[in-house]
Each structure stands twice: as structure tokens, then as C-alpha cells.
UniProtKB/Swiss-Prot annotation:
Keywords: Chloroplast, Plastid, Ribonucleoprotein, Ribosomal protein, RNA-binding, rRNA-binding. One of its GO terms (biological process) is translation. Residues 99-109 have a biased composition (Basic and acidic residues). Belongs to the bacterial ribosomal protein bS18 family. The keyword Zinc-finger does not apply. One of its GO terms (cellular component) is mitochondrial small ribosomal subunit. InterPro entries: Ribosomal_bS18, Ribosomal_bS18_CS, Ribosomal_bS18_sf. This is Small ribosomal subunit protein bS18c. The gene is rps18. Coiled coil: none annotated. GO terms for molecular function: small ribosomal subunit rRNA binding; structural constituent of ribosome. Residues 91-115 are annotated as: Disordered. Part of the 30S ribosomal subunit.
Length: 115
């Protein structure tokens, strides 16, 4: 048989079903912080359903619980861990440039007032 005439054969890989992220005993509630915190990113954003591997109903309930927890100040809207790092050469140059612009504006305004 010709190589081009052979049927395409897929390799048989073993398929291991992943455990669902939410077990049947878990209650999706704004007070269940250990459960809710698993579905929030490093920056404090709610992860998508595709990343979480949740059903539509579970994702909706998780989103509502996270929003309720944020409103009740149980969860921050943004993570505090996301801090400004030390300045680099690029940021220093940018700061210097903006300071020069501000100084030029002040001089221009002073000269304008004198006239």
C-alpha cells in the first residue's frame, strides 16, 4: 500500500480525567475564603471559566461570591503584593524629562505674566 493511501492513525494516549476544582461538598459562599481564593489571579482578577475548569453555573456563583466578599471587605479589589519595584534607568530618564517639561512650563508662564 502506498504511504499516501494509508489511513491516518492517531496514537492512543491514556486519558486521565481531572478532578473537578469544586467538590460536591464545597459550598460556594462569600464566607468560604479558602475556596474563593483559588479562583483569583495574582493581581486580584477573577480567573476565566476556561482556566478554572468550572461549569457555567459554578463560575457564575463563584463570581457573585467574590464580588460580595469584595464589597464586604473580606477580599481586596486589588492585591497588595503588586508593588512598584525600584526605579530603572528608563523610569529615571522619564522622570527627568517630565521635570524638565514642568520647569519649562513654569518659566513660560512667568515670562507671560511679566509681559
Amino acid at each position: 500500500m502506498d504511504k499516501s493511501k494509508r489511513p491516518f492513525l492517531k496514537s492512543k494516549r491514556s486519558f486521565r480525567r481531572r478532578l473537578p476544582p469544586i467538590q460536591s461538598g464545597d459550598r460556594i459562599d462569600y464566607r468560604n475564603m479558602s475556596l474563593i481564593s483559588r479562583f483569583i489571579s495574582e493581581q486580584g482578577k477573577i480567573l476565566s471559566r476556561r482556566v478554572n475548569r468550572l461549569t457555567l453555573k459554578q463560575q457564575r456563583l463563584i463570581t457573585l461570591a467574590i464580588k460580595q466578599a469584595r464589597i464586604l471587605s473580606l477580599l481586596p479589589f486589588k492585591r497588595k503584593g503588586f508593588q512598584i519595584s525600584e526605579s530603572t534607568a528608563r523610569t529615571n530618564a522619564l522622570k527627568a524629562r517630565t521635570q524638565n517639561k514642568d520647569q519649562k512650563k513654569e518659566k513660560f508662564q512667568i515670562n507671560k505674566k511679566k509681559k
